[in-house]
């Protein structure tokens, strides 16, 4: 455990976790132990993050230009997680520009757990009663769950409704239909986090940085980038 590591007087920590760990991160930083967070920001702690907000805005803009007018966002509740919050804000901010669109937002706490099962429940329990032109999700597993349930209910993806994921999981390229998603350079994230931590350990400055992401257009939604 992290507490056991701290007892061994480690030189520093690179932390990639969820919002439940924020108090622990803040506690470690308060002890003046060098710490870097990856894929999320926690206060003023040095971090390496992705441009989540801008990427979702770009996705929404492209889908609007292709003719989509009824949008839906399905994702985990973003409370306390900067990466999820930025994806959500990218969606809402992008749609503010377009007065002729409608938007439905479905945030579900249980999506933090079994994303695939919870996403399928949106259709099996008829939570989604009116099909949007496109559903933008915060995670590939959520997108896959909705696609699976839609298929069982006779809904064709992407002809009846388009859907996008986020994080380019290994199965998304082979899912039927393949999932339009966002690719994150995890290797670059790791390299920058390590370099930043070494700077902190050596009493040098550590400047937070943001990594750009790539939208991967596949069969579930056509995005022209």
Regions found by a protein language model. Give the residues of each.
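Hinge/beta->alpha junction and helix N-cap segments in small-molecule ligand-binding domains
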Residues: 48-58, 74-96, 101-122, 136-144, ...
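Nucleotide donor/acceptor-binding cores
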Residues: 60-70, 213
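Short acidic capping loops at alpha-helix termini that bridge into adjacent secondary structure
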Residues: 70, 101-104, 157-162
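Flexible loop/turn connectors
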Residues: 123-225
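Alpha-helical recognition/docking segments in bacterial nutrient-uptake
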Residues: 1-61, 127-128
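Short acidic/polar active-site loop segments enriched in Thr and Asp
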Residues: 11, 68-71, 133
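Anion (oxyanion) recognition and catalysis
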Residues: 29, 96, 151
């Amino acid at each position: 455990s992290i507490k056991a590591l701290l007892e061994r007087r480690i030189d520093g920590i690179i932390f990639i976790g969820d919002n439940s760990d924020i108090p622990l991160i803040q506690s470690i930083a308060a002890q003046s132990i060098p710490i870097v967070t990856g894929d999320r920001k926690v206060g003023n702690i040095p971090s390496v993050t992705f441009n989540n907000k801008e990427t979702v805005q770009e996705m929404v803009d492209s889908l609007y230009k292709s003719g989509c007018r009824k949008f839906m966002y399905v994702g985990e509740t973003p409370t306390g997680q900067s990466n999820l919050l930025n994806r959500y804000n990218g969606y809402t901010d992008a749609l503010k520009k377009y007065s002729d669109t409608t938007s439905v937002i479905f945030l579900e706490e249980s999506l933090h757990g079994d994303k695939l099962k919870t996403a399928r429940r949106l259709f099996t329990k008829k939570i989604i009663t009116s099909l949007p032109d496109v559903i933008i999700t915060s995670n590939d597993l959520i997108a896959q769950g909705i696609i699976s349930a839609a298929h069982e209910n006779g809904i064709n993806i992407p002809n009846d409704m388009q859907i996008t994921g986020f994080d380019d999981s290994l199965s998304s390229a082979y899912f039927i239909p393949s999932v339009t998603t966002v690719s994150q350079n995890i290797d670059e994230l790791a390299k920058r986090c390590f370099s930043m931590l070494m700077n902190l350990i050596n009493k040098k400055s550590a400047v937070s940085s943001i990594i750009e992401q790539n939208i991967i257009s596949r069969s579930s939604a056509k995005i022209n980038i």
